């Protein structure tokens, strides 16, 4: 087990942010201050396991588990609402790592 040695984490999101990204937000918010910057996430609180039957050409992905954090919280079916709402596509895009990027700029200045 390790320690991130952080007090606060900023997560940059878009409307298609889901699944593993939301799992990270939900899991870490039990341990530190997690701030969401961007758009509301998708809201996927479950996981699936895909199986393929080649003989019948059938692929199924049933829901096999519900994701909770250590506090038994899984209350993001409607997604995580951003602490700072930004539509990154309403302004000019910048190079990766450039502080002119609206999401990164907000995270760095907080």
What residue spans do the PLM features occupy?
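C-terminal "post-core" interaction segments
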Residues: 1-110
């Amino acid at each position: 087990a390790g320690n991130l040695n952080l007090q606060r984490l900023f997560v940059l999101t878009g409307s298609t942010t889901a699944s593993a990204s939301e799992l990270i937000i939900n899991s870490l918010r039990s341990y530190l201050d997690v701030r969401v910057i961007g758009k509301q996430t998708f809201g996927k609180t479950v996981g699936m396991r895909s199986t393929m039957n080649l003989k019948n050409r059938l692929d199924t992905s049933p829901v096999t588990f519900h994701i909770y954090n250590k506090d038994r919280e899984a209350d993001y079916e409607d997604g995580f609402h951003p602490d700072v709402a930004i539509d990154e596509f309403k302004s000019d895009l910048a190079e990766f790592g450039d502080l002119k990027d609206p999401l990164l700029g907000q995270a760095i200045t907080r």
